[in-house]
């Protein structure tokens, strides 16, 4: 599996894109910065998008993608997957014909650009040879991470935004995860804010990793605040985990 890091930042600044991870050029996990980075041809290859939660930095590009499709020559369709509360928020507060046109009924309800599909935590769905399972994670709004397995039984887990989530690690125990992409947003000195907003710090990450057995082969950090990137990197390096590193926009992960 090839995962292209379209964006992995915890805040938007020049050179720092909101979260979006593209699997083998065709399946997207979160959609924070899709349309501002990929050209039209690459955008139109994406038919399925899995959303971890409904915060704006994870869904922002979906409206612009729908708009690019409807005005283009290739009238492709895109399916948006997530748990019920996330789908409901996207439908009610985004595609409501007030904030943005309702592309779930455009050009007509029977042939719409967007199809919203609800998932249940712990239940798998098969897409293009991949098995995808959502697992609940701890965040300030309903949120999930995704366990993804290919035909060769290679697996990665993408946490999305998450604070300490011991129940999640119990549920994916013994899955032999080859790659973990996990949120570390703040330096350890900001632990109180991290816990209040349901994110991780390097110290909290260390505690979480102690709960994951077996430990994933490689661990990638996503969602760091650009203002604290150097501090977070220094603290991550001090943990002495040989297989942990912070992602940057444009990175390619091969699982």
Regions found by a protein language model. Give the residues of each.
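Conserved beta-strand hairpin/beta-sheet module of binuclear metal-dependent hydrolase folds
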Residues: 1-42, 144-160
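Divalent metal-coordination and catalytic microenvironments
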Residues: 3, 21, 29-30, 53, ...
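Active-site neighborhood of phospho(di)ester-bond hydrolases with catalytic His/Asp-centered motifs
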Residues: 29-32, 47-57, 81-83, 157-162, ...
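Active-site metal-binding motif and surrounding structural segment of the metallo-beta-lactamase
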Residues: 35-82, 178
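Short amphipathic alpha-helix with an adjacent loop that forms part of the alpha/beta core around
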Residues: 38-43, 64, 125-128, 169-174, ...
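Short, surface-exposed connector motifs at secondary-structure boundaries
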Residues: 75, 152-154, 213-219
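Metallo-beta-lactamase
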Residues: 85-143, 151, 242-254
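Cap/insert and terminal regions of metallo-dependent hydrolase folds
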Residues: 164-254
């Amino acid at each position: 599996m090839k995962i292209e890091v379209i964006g992995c930042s915890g805040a938007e600044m020049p050179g720092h894109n909101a979260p979006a991870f593209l699997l083998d050029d065709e399946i997207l996990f979160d959609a924070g910065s899709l349309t501002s980075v990929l050209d039209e041809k690459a955008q139109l290859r994406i038919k399925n998008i899995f959303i971890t939660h409904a915060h704006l930095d994870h869904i922002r590009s979906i409206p612009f993608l729908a708009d690019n499709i409807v005005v283009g020559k290739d009238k492709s369709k895109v399916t948006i997957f997530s748990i019920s509360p996330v789908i409901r928020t996207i439908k009610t507060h985004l595609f409501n014909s007030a904030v943005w046109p309702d592309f779930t009924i455009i050009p007509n309800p029977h042939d719409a650009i967007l199809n919203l599909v609800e998932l249940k935590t712990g239940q798998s769905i098969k897409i293009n040879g991949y098995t995808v399972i959502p697992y609940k994670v701890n965040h300030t709004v309903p949120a999930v991470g995704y366990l993804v397995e290919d035909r060769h039984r290679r697996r990665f887990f993408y946490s999305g935004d998450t604070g300490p989530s011991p129940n999640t690690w119990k549920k994916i125990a013994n899955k032999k995860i080859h790659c973990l992409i996990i949120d570390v947003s703040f330096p350890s000195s900001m632990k109180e804010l991290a816990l209040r907003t349901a994110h991780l710090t390097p110290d909290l990450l260390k505690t979480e990793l102690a709960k994951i057995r077996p430990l994933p082969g490689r661990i990638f950090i996503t969602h760091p605040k650009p203002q604290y990137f150097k501090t977070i990197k220094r603290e991550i390096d001090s943990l002495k985990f040989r297989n942990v590193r912070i992602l940057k926009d444009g990175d390619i992960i091969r699982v």
